[in-house]
Amino acid sequence: MTNIRKTHPLLKIVNSSFVDLPAPSSLSSWWNFGSLLGVCLGVQILTGLFLAMHYTSDTATAFNSVTHICRDVNYGWLLRYLHANGASMFFICLYLHVGRGLYYGSYTYSETWNIGILLLFAVMATAFMGYVLPWGQMSFWGATVITNLLSAIPYIGTDLVQWIWGGFSVDKATLTRFFAFHFLLPFIVTALVMVHLLFLHETGSNNPTGIPSDPDMIPFHPYYTIKDILGFLVMLTALSTLVLFSPDLLGDPDNYIPANPLITPPHIKPEWYFLFAYAILRSIPNKLGGVLALVMSILILAIVPILHVSKQRSMMFRPLSQCLFWFLVAILFTLTWIGGQPVEHPYIIIGQTASVLYFLIILFLMPMTSMVENYLLKW
């Protein structure tokens, strides 16, 4: 008799996606981050749901409701810090996942890649709105500064900002709508994840070599299920360690001060995972130019498949491109550091240099290096 997992209308979808799915035999640990992101999303939705049961999205009570969660709700402190640090873990996995895609040429699956970029934007929007909800100083001023950037859009900018604010400043209406969207977006992200997986399973996975692996496939279960479970354990151990030993390591102390529109914090900055984009924004003296550079710093990923001129898909056998890739990683770390520094000499010039190099590497140096490698291989 045929196994029920192969005949049941619902189970056979699960079976073809997670059990009998043919997978390349050479996948390294860099392929673990997709499933880790799934776990992060699950943790965020669960902890967020329980936090929403106790949170109030009103400017008068939002800060106190978060304090109440931490002090009076059973394991409320654990929920709050799991949610806050879970977001950091989410972005660590996201950036590593995107980095893996760039290194091994996974972007040649253009549908999967483009849905991934859409997912990145959706998760960033969710995280930004979530950061506003505790209604601390950095929440309020971060929301004010970032939403105010939209006023740089010609003609409609000012009206657009006031429409998003629901008034003439960030206030109760802004907080309420941000809470509504912050609750809704993760479910949209979940739907996009399903589309992402649908497109991925149309083509099958890439592998470290970048060579088609059709002749050498193995079933996803038990090989990669066990491997993924090990990844879950490692990540959840790291997250638990962060939450239980140093929950405020990645947060901003200013967010423990209730929001006050009359006092501006000395350094307004977003969470660490947005600092690289924030540094690029600050590097350009013109407001509209800065906003365009900020958007392009992420949207540039969409043109990476067009810029792929190498005869080889993966960077595994391309040492020159590898050097350039790791230089790009170093630039991103530099930008993250600069984003957290005050706007003064020498940080300004370092930020501007790193921003120029970031775009230069992706737009010009990587394609040129690929051409040189093609020539060296006499193709």
Swiss-Prot record:
<dbReference type="GO" id="GO:0008121">
    <property type="term" value="F:ubiquinol-cytochrome-c reductase activity"/>
</dbReference>
<comment type="function">
    <text>Component of the ubiquinol-cytochrome c reductase complex (complex III or cytochrome b-c1 complex) that is part of the mitochondrial respiratory chain. The b-c1 complex mediates electron transfer from ubiquinol to cytochrome c. Contributes to the generation of a proton gradient across the mitochondrial membrane that is then used for ATP synthesis.</text>
</comment>
<keyword id="KW-0813">Transport</keyword>
<keyword id="KW-0812">Transmembrane</keyword>
<keyword id="KW-0472">Membrane</keyword>
<comment type="similarity">
    <text>Belongs to the cytochrome b family.</text>
</comment>
<feature type="transmembrane region" description="Helical">
    <location>
        <begin position="178"/>
        <end position="198"/>
    </location>
</feature>
<dbReference type="InterPro" id="IPR027387">
    <property type="entry name" value="Cytb/b6-like_sf"/>
</dbReference>
<dbReference type="InterPro" id="IPR048259">
    <property type="entry name" value="Cytochrome_b_N_euk/bac"/>
</dbReference>
<feature type="transmembrane region" description="Helical">
    <location>
        <begin position="347"/>
        <end position="367"/>
    </location>
</feature>
<feature type="transmembrane region" description="Helical">
    <location>
        <begin position="288"/>
        <end position="308"/>
    </location>
</feature>
<keyword id="KW-0249">Electron transport</keyword>
<dbReference type="InterPro" id="IPR005798">
    <property type="entry name" value="Cyt_b/b6_C"/>
</dbReference>
<dbReference type="InterPro" id="IPR030689">
    <property type="entry name" value="Cytochrome_b"/>
</dbReference>
<keyword id="KW-0408">Iron</keyword>
<keyword id="KW-0679">Respiratory chain</keyword>
<dbReference type="GO" id="GO:0045275">
    <property type="term" value="C:respiratory chain complex III"/>
</dbReference>
<keyword id="KW-0479">Metal-binding</keyword>
<feature type="binding site">
    <location>
        <position position="201"/>
    </location>
    <ligand>
        <name>a ubiquinone</name>
    </ligand>
</feature>
<feature type="transmembrane region" description="Helical">
    <location>
        <begin position="33"/>
        <end position="53"/>
    </location>
</feature>
<keyword id="KW-0496">Mitochondrion</keyword>
<keyword id="KW-0830">Ubiquinone</keyword>
<feature type="binding site" description="axial binding residue">
    <location>
        <position position="97"/>
    </location>
    <ligand>
        <name>heme b b566</name>
    </ligand>
</feature>
<keyword id="KW-0349">Heme</keyword>
<keyword id="KW-0999">Mitochondrion inner membrane</keyword>
<protein>
    <recommendedName>
        <fullName>Cytochrome b</fullName>
    </recommendedName>
</protein>
<dbReference type="InterPro" id="IPR005797">
    <property type="entry name" value="Cyt_b/b6_N"/>
</dbReference>
<dbReference type="GO" id="GO:0046872">
    <property type="term" value="F:metal ion binding"/>
</dbReference>
<dbReference type="GO" id="GO:0006122">
    <property type="term" value="P:mitochondrial electron transport, ubiquinol to cytochrome c"/>
</dbReference>
<dbReference type="Pfam" id="PF00033">
    <property type="entry name" value="Cytochrome_B"/>
</dbReference>
<feature type="transmembrane region" description="Helical">
    <location>
        <begin position="320"/>
        <end position="340"/>
    </location>
</feature>
<keyword id="KW-1133">Transmembrane helix</keyword>
<feature type="binding site" description="axial binding residue">
    <location>
        <position position="196"/>
    </location>
    <ligand>
        <name>heme b b566</name>
    </ligand>
</feature>
<feature type="transmembrane region" description="Helical">
    <location>
        <begin position="77"/>
        <end position="98"/>
    </location>
</feature>
<dbReference type="InterPro" id="IPR016174">
    <property type="entry name" value="Di-haem_cyt_TM"/>
</dbReference>
<dbReference type="Pfam" id="PF00032">
    <property type="entry name" value="Cytochrom_B_C"/>
</dbReference>
<feature type="binding site" description="axial binding residue">
    <location>
        <position position="182"/>
    </location>
    <ligand>
        <name>heme b b562</name>
    </ligand>
</feature>
<dbReference type="InterPro" id="IPR048260">
    <property type="entry name" value="Cytochrome_b_C_euk/bac"/>
</dbReference>
<dbReference type="GO" id="GO:0005743">
    <property type="term" value="C:mitochondrial inner membrane"/>
</dbReference>
<comment type="subunit">
    <text>The cytochrome bc1 complex contains 11 subunits: 3 respiratory subunits (MT-CYB, CYC1 and UQCRFS1), 2 core proteins (UQCRC1 and UQCRC2) and 6 low-molecular weight proteins (UQCRH/QCR6, UQCRB/QCR7, UQCRQ/QCR8, UQCR10/QCR9, UQCR11/QCR10 and a cleavage product of UQCRFS1). This cytochrome bc1 complex then forms a dimer.</text>
</comment>
<dbReference type="InterPro" id="IPR036150">
    <property type="entry name" value="Cyt_b/b6_C_sf"/>
</dbReference>
<feature type="transmembrane region" description="Helical">
    <location>
        <begin position="226"/>
        <end position="246"/>
    </location>
</feature>
